[in-house]
Structures are given as C-alpha cells and as structure tokens.
C-alpha cells in the first residue's frame, strides 16, 4: 500500500468516525433520527438471541439469524451503537479489497481516484454509519471476487454461498462467474474447466445448504418463511423508489387478504434482464470485464426490483470503480448521466419529504410520476452501460495473468 493509499484509508476512517459521532448527536438532539429504522430491528432481534430466543420474535425481522448473532455484542457490552461500528469495519474492509483489485488493473493515480468512489462516498458512509447491514454483504461479495481472481475456487465458493445465505440476490452472479471460470481455464483443457466449475459450484452449494440446514434446525420453518419465502410474495406498502410500488399497492388494495397477484409476476422482467446481462461476460471473458458485468447486472436487478431504497444502490456501487476503470463513456456524457441519476432521485425525495414529514397525500400523481421518471432514467442508463460494455477493451496485466 502506497503513502497515498494509506492517507486515503486514514481519511476514510476519520470521515466515518465523524459521521458516526454526528449520528449519535443527532439521535439525542433532533426529532428526525440518524439511525436507520432497520437497525432497531437488528438490535431488538439480537436481544432475543442474547436471551436464548428466536430473532423472529421481533416483528419485521426478515433476515438470516446470522445477522442478529452479529449484533449480540450490543447487549453483552450494553452499547446500542456497537453494531454500527461492526458495519463500519466491514465497510472499510470492502474498500480495501476494492483498492487491492483496482491496483492490479490500472495506474495508481487513477486507482486512487476510483477507490475514493467507495471510501469517500457520502451515500456509502451514511448507510453503514446509520446501522444498515449492507456492508456485511458487500464485504462477502468482494472477498468472493478476490479469491476468484486468485483461482482459489473452494474459498471463493464458501464466501459466495455465505453471501447468498445473507441475501438471495447474489445468486444472479453465478452465470457470469461460471462463464469467466470456463474461459479462464480453456487453455488447460476441458477436464480442468469442469473440475474448476465443480469446485466452486459444490463449495457454494454446500455452504448455502449447510447454513440453511443449521438455521432450520435451530429456528424451524419460521426461518425459511421469514428469511426467504417472504421475499417472493412481499408487497411493500411503504413508499420507495420502485415503479412497482404504487402498482402493487393499488392491486393489493382490491384484494380481501391485502395480497397482490401482480407481486408474483413482477420479478419476470427482472429475471429476464439479469439473465441476459449476465451473459455479457461471453463478450469479453476476462476478470476485469466480469467486474463490469456484475455492475451492469446488479444495476438492472435493482432498477427492476419491486422494492428499491437508497441502500440497494450500494449493491452496484461496489462495482462502479471497476466499471469506470474501463469505460469508454466521455466525461461530458458521464456528467449528464450522473446528473440525471441524482436529479431524478432528488425529485422523488422531495415528494417523499412532503408525504413523510408534512403528511401530504402526494402518492398520485407526485410520487408515482417521480418513480416513473427515476425508472425511465435508470432504463436509459442501463442501455448506455450495456452499449459501453460491448466495446472491446485492451487486456490488462491482471487479465494476462488470469489467461
């Protein structure tokens, strides 16, 4: 690690400390809390675990029990904010892995700028210091890719299986990862290709099923229903960025049981898109391109998801530095794209403010139109990303080593 990278790491740590301390101050002195509402759910679920009970005794806890186990120290040491410190550590480690992978592909100066997109990103910092657990998943995914690049497929598979156990969505990465491994080992013969694929596949499956079986043995069907099955029929009535939100809300309002039939089919266009974008790795089956494909694939997944909040943006922001390291998009067009992405968010947030803090009924047309604008913008951005990723790039040192 160079002096500049040490400086960036220290600065990013200090900024997070500042956000963390300000959050504690805001919680104590302002009506609007800094702490994420989900953190209270994690904290309460951890209390039940600490008392020898099920985390699902806490209403609205819809996650793996491992997450509640992670916050048990909150109650052991008697400090409410300790879990946030844990999430910030995962956040920083994620940034360090990004730094490691970027340094193998581009110049140090450019890498330093791109690393800052994660390490000094106020959105990323806010999400982890507010007590959102996305940094844990991001760290697991980055470690998966780190060991994948080194061809340590068993370890990569274990971490990948753990990632899917934490949240289902990383399973979409299996297609581009399989394509990368298949082509990465093409010079070593079909037997090596098959062995490598079986290695990561079996280690992933064993870890995923092992974690699932262990949690099922401890917490029973409640674990399966709350951690996994719930998300298949989920209809989130709370306002969020998704264009599906209003449609699902209106559809469920017409049903006696409050469930939406539309919710069952909302994932179809999303599934088709992630399958197609995942196959973009065939276009250029290198490790650098794999990281770019994962960005595009995750962007498509979040854009078409039936629930979309700011924390979901972190899912693809971990790949943004890698995408930008090989992009052909000029700075003027890039600035326009960023402005549209931020601007349409701002329009939606203004409507959300009127609804949540002023109690105004802006569901329609205000909030709905804002969601449509954000969705259309993201669809256009997705098209630009796909077009850009199909342009051939020169192989880097890291790709030559892999091949």
Curated annotation (Swiss-Prot):
It is found in: Endoplasmic reticulum membrane. Residues 1-4, 100-110, 150-160, 215-266, 332-334, 383-403 are cytoplasmic. Its EC number is 2.4.1.-. It is a multi-pass membrane protein. The chain crosses the membrane at residues 5-25, 79-99, 111-131, 133-149, 161-181, 194-214, 267-287, 311-331, 335-355, 362-382. Its main location: endoplasmic reticulum. One of its GO terms (cellular component) is endoplasmic reticulum. GO terms for molecular function: alpha-1,4-mannosyltransferase activity; glycolipid mannosyltransferase activity. Keywords: Cell wall biogenesis/degradation, Endoplasmic reticulum, Glycosyltransferase, GPI-anchor biosynthesis, Membrane, Transferase, Transmembrane, Transmembrane helix. Pathway: Glycolipid biosynthesis; glycosylphosphatidylinositol-anchor biosynthesis. One of its GO terms (biological process) is protein mannosylation. The keyword Protein transport does not apply. It is an enzyme of class 2 (transferase). Coiled coil: none annotated. Residues 26-78, 132, 182-193, 288-310, 356-361 are lumenal. PANTHER family: GPI MANNOSYLTRANSFERASE 1, PIG-M MANNOSYLTRANSFERASE. Belongs to the PIGM family. Mannosyltransferase involved in glycosylphosphatidylinositol-anchor biosynthesis. Transfers the first alpha-1,4-mannose to GlcN-acyl-PI during GPI precursor assembly. Required for cell wall integrity. This is GPI mannosyltransferase 1. It comes from Saccharomyces cerevisiae (strain ATCC 204508 / S288c) (Baker's yeast). The gene is GPI14.
């Amino acid at each position: 690690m160079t002096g500049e990278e040490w400086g960036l790491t220290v600065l990013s740590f200090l900024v997070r400390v500042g956000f963390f301390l300000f959050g504690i101050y805001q919680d104590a002195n302002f009506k609007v809390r800094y702490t994420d509402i989900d953190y209270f759910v994690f904290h309460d679920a951890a209390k039940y675990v600490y008392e020898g009970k099920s985390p699902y005794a806490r209403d609205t806890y819809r996650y793996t029990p491992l997450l509640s186990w992670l916050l048990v120290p909150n109650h052991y040491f008697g400090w409410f904010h300790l879990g946030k410190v844990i999430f910030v550590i995962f956040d920083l480690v994620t940034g360090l892995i990004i730094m490691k992978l970027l340094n193998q592909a581009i110049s140090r100066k450019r890498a330093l700028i791109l690393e800052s997109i994660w390490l000094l990103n106020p959105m990323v910092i806010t999400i982890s210091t507010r007590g959102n657990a996305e940094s844990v998943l991001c760290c697991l995914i980055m470690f998966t890719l780190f060991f994948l690049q080194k061809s340590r497929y068993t370890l990569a598979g274990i971490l990948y299986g753990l990632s899917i156990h934490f949240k289902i969505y990383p399973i979409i990465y299996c297609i581009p990862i399989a394509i990368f491994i298949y082509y990465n080992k093409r010079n070593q013969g079909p037997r090596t290709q098959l062995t490598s694929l079986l290695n990561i596949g079996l280690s992933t499956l064993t870890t995923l099923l092992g974690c699932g079986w262990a949690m099922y043995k401890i917490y029973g069907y409640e674990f399966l229903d709350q951690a996994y099955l719930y998300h298949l029929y989920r209809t989130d009535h709370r306002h969020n960025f998704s264009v599906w939100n209003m449609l699902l809300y209106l559809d469920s309002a017409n049903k006696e049981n409050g469930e939406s039939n539309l919710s069952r089919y909302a994932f179809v266009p999303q599934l088709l898109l992630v399958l197609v974008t995942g196959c973009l790795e065939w276009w250029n089956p290198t490790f650098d391109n794999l990281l770019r494909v994962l960005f595009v694939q995750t962007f498509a997944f979040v854009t078409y998801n039936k629930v979309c909040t700011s924390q979901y943006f972190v899912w693809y922001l971990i790949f943004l530095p890698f995408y930008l390291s090989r992009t052909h998009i000029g700075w003027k067009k890039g600035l326009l794209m960023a402005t549209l992405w931020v601007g349409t968010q701002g329009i939606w947030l203004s409507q959300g403010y009127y609804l949540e803090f002023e109690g105004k009924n802006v569901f329609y047309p205000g909030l709905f139109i804002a969601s449509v604008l954000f969705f259309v913008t993201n669809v256009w951005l997705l098209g630009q990303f796909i077009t850009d990723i199909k342009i051939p790039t020169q192989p880097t040192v890291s790709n030559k080593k892999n091949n």
